[in-house]
Every structure is written in structure tokens, then in C-alpha cells.
Design a protein with these regions (language model features):
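Structural alpha/beta surface segment adjacent to cysteine/selenocysteine redox centers
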Residues: 1-79, 109-114
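C-terminal cap of thioredoxin/glutaredoxin-like
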Residues: 7, 13-16, 75-144
Length: 144
């Protein structure tokens, strides 16, 4: 997903609802910032938030809040979810984050993902936005 992708943002609340309703569903988020520098800054900030154990709330805020995705607005949102922004900025400089994103790009290429959003359910790629009903149906069909 890309934090600035309108279709990703539209699918996010449905994805969160499905996640919250089923203990059997495991969601692995893969940041795939393809819509410019602001997308990359948001992805790096979200990944850096893992160091403060606040990835999930920050990820949800980035996906649902109406911000312009400038670094100042991302930092304001980070503060709102309880992140220490000085530490966040330090953690954003960690080269492991860029290595992680590089591996994600490689994985996307290998899987044939060339846009956002994309979902992989039980090993099958579903490109494009999915509604809650679509997600529930595909998960049920996979035995989940």
C-alpha cells in the first residue's frame, strides 16, 4: 500500500474492520511508496514507529486522517498518536528501513504487483481496492 493512494485509503477502514472481527485473519502490511517523496516519507515514518511500538496506531492514523503528507503534518500526526518525534526522526534515518523498502519493491516485482493497493489472500494476488464484503468473501473462500 501507499499512504497517499486514494484507493488504499478507501479500503483501509474495511480492512481494519475485518482484522478486528476475526482472530483467524493475519494481516501483513507492506509499505510500497510509489506516489512520490511524500509517500516515501510517510512509509519511512511508519516503519520507524515500530521502534516505539506504535506502528499500528500510527499506520491507522496515516491511512484515515486527512493530512497533506508534508513532513510537518506527518510529525503532528505522530505526536497525536503518542510518538516521541525526536526519536522518530532519529529512527527514520536507520538504513535498515531503506533496506526493508528495497526488499518490498523486490517482492512486489516478484509477485507481479505494480500498483496499489494489492492484497494477497491465501497466496492469490488481488490487485486494486477491495470492499469489506469482497475481503470477507475472499477470506471465507480461503478457509479463513
Amino acid at each position: 500500500f501507499d499512504y497517499r493512494c486514494g484507493y488504499c485509503r478507501r479500503s483501509a477502514p474495511d480492512l481494519f474492520a475485518v482484522r478486528d472481527e476475526s482472530q483467524a485473519v493475519k494481516i501483513i502490511y507492506k509499505e510500497f511508496p510509489i506516489l512520490g517523496d511524500a509517500s516515501r516519507v510517510a512509509a519511512v515514518a511508519a516503519l520507524a514507529a515500530r521502534e516505539q511500538d506504535l506502528y499500528e496506531p500510527f499506520h491507522e492514523a496515516l491511512m484515515t486522517q486527512d493530512i497533506d503528507f508534508s513532513q510537518p503534518s506527518i510529525m503532528t500526526l505522530a505526536t497525536e498518536v503518542g510518538l516521541d518525534t525526536d526519536q522518530l526522526l532519529d529512527d527514520m534515518a536507520d538504513p535498515e528501513i531503506q533496506e526493508y523498502l528495497d526488499r518490498t519493491y523486490e517482492l512486489a516485482r516478484a509477485l507481479g504487483v505494480n500498483g496499489t493497493p494489492a492484497f494477497i489472500i491465501d497466496g492469490v494476488l488481488y490487485p486494486g481496492a477491495l470492499s469489506r464484503a469482497d475481503l470477507e468473501q475472499l477470506i471465507a473462500m480461503s478457509g479463513g
